[in-house]
């Protein structure tokens, strides 16, 4: 599996609008096992995104989907920046298939 955890920043006061765009574009994407959007209780303009994919290629391919491209274009004016993005290797958990770690 392939995972990403990222923190995005909306322009001041636009967090909810940006979350609406992200939530509208998170329908069934091939290879996507989990796509979670969360607010940051300590930061009114921050959004955390946690993704789990079957593999990195599925994530990369998702960025070319027309609905994802449309969401990126719609959100671009209200994205203030990306604070960081971390790649992970999920090994399982509630709702995910187990992966051998050895």
Question: What annotation goes with each model-predicted range?
Answer:
Residues 1-47, 52-66, 77-102:
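Short S/T/G/P-rich N-terminal loop/turn motif that feeds into the first structured element of a domain
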């Amino acid at each position: 599996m392939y995972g990403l955890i990222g923190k995005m920043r909306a322009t001041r006061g636009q967090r909810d609008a940006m979350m609406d765009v992200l939530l509208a574009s998170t329908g069934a994407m091939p290879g996507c096992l989990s796509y979670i959007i969360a607010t940051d209780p300590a930061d009114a303009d921050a959004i955390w995104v946690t993704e789990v994919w079957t593999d990195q290629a599925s994530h990369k391919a998702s960025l070319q989907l027309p609905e994802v491209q449309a969401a990126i274009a719609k959100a671009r004016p209200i994205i203030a920046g990306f604070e960081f993005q971390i790649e992970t290797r999920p090994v399982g958990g509630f709702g995910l298939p187990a992966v051998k770690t050895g």
